[in-house]
Amino acid sequence: MAAGLITIKRRIQSITNTRKITKAMGLIATSTLRKARRNLDANLSYYSSFEDVMKKVSSGILGENIYTNGNGSKEKLYITMTSDAGLCGGFNGNVVNAAVSEISKDRENSLIMSVGQKGRGYFKRLQYDTIAEYVDIQNEPTLTEAKTISEHALSLYNKGEIGEINIVYSKFISTIKQDIIIKRVLPFDMKDIKYDGSIEFEPEINELIEGIVAVYLKSQLFNFLLNSKASEQASKMTAMDSATKNANELLDDLNLRYNRIRQSAITQEITEIVSGAEAQK
């Protein structure tokens, strides 16, 4: 019985230590999420305005153009956005599963550019090759990081090595809801886009388009990185809160078992003492 008490006591101590860690990590994730949401909200106005401008710009492009009509390549690029660290619930698995599900439809003509350590690990285990890997993205992504990724992807597109650029990321909706999105950013989706003549271009738009597309793609990547980081921290906060709750439930159960065994041991000792005293009469 004493051995059983010692074992339970050790488990209680171990789970208590684990709870301290999960609680601390949950608090850190909450703080980091607050910053991530602030950055996302600050960028939203610029991103939305730029999206509207790009629709007008793309509608004003004259004749055949690779950014509106495609470049003839069958290869599709998928840029997947995962985290560098773990312990964030199903965040990484959901992104990779969505990417793999889409890629499996035409694996022969699909290429992967992985953002985040976890994505790289997932694809390696699933035996999917990647053409580029970007890791150690900051919790507060920078335009420089977005530019590095977007320039690489755009270079491949301009050279005709890929015919589509798709981003697979987790869109932040709220602390408890994030949606996995697969968005094609190039070539532009011209459906329902018509030139309304509200913008005049000087010089002609076809002379400006390559530079505009570079800025547009960087803006897209930056927005997706911000969404991804906010989603990551929300998932981590939820996972750590759940782990802390589970630890509390385990501790309640173990403490109850410990007290029952201890009470039983004390009762047995009292019974033995009383029995011994009775025997001596």
UniProtKB/Swiss-Prot annotation:
<dbReference type="InterPro" id="IPR000131">
    <property type="entry name" value="ATP_synth_F1_gsu"/>
</dbReference>
<keyword id="KW-0472">Membrane</keyword>
<keyword id="KW-0406">Ion transport</keyword>
<dbReference type="InterPro" id="IPR035968">
    <property type="entry name" value="ATP_synth_F1_ATPase_gsu"/>
</dbReference>
<dbReference type="GO" id="GO:0045259">
    <property type="term" value="C:proton-transporting ATP synthase complex"/>
</dbReference>
<keyword id="KW-0813">Transport</keyword>
<dbReference type="GO" id="GO:0005886">
    <property type="term" value="C:plasma membrane"/>
</dbReference>
<dbReference type="InterPro" id="IPR023632">
    <property type="entry name" value="ATP_synth_F1_gsu_CS"/>
</dbReference>
<comment type="similarity">
    <text>Belongs to the ATPase gamma chain family.</text>
</comment>
<keyword id="KW-0139">CF(1)</keyword>
<comment type="subunit">
    <text>F-type ATPases have 2 components, CF(1) - the catalytic core - and CF(0) - the membrane proton channel. CF(1) has five subunits: alpha(3), beta(3), gamma(1), delta(1), epsilon(1). CF(0) has three main subunits: a, b and c.</text>
</comment>
<keyword id="KW-0066">ATP synthesis</keyword>
<keyword id="KW-1003">Cell membrane</keyword>
<dbReference type="GO" id="GO:0005524">
    <property type="term" value="F:ATP binding"/>
</dbReference>
<dbReference type="Pfam" id="PF00231">
    <property type="entry name" value="ATP-synt"/>
</dbReference>
<protein>
    <recommendedName>
        <fullName>ATP synthase gamma chain</fullName>
    </recommendedName>
</protein>
<comment type="function">
    <text>Produces ATP from ADP in the presence of a proton gradient across the membrane. The gamma chain is believed to be important in regulating ATPase activity and the flow of protons through the CF(0) complex.</text>
</comment>
<keyword id="KW-0375">Hydrogen ion transport</keyword>
<dbReference type="GO" id="GO:0042777">
    <property type="term" value="P:proton motive force-driven plasma membrane ATP synthesis"/>
</dbReference>
<dbReference type="GO" id="GO:0046933">
    <property type="term" value="F:proton-transporting ATP synthase activity, rotational mechanism"/>
</dbReference>
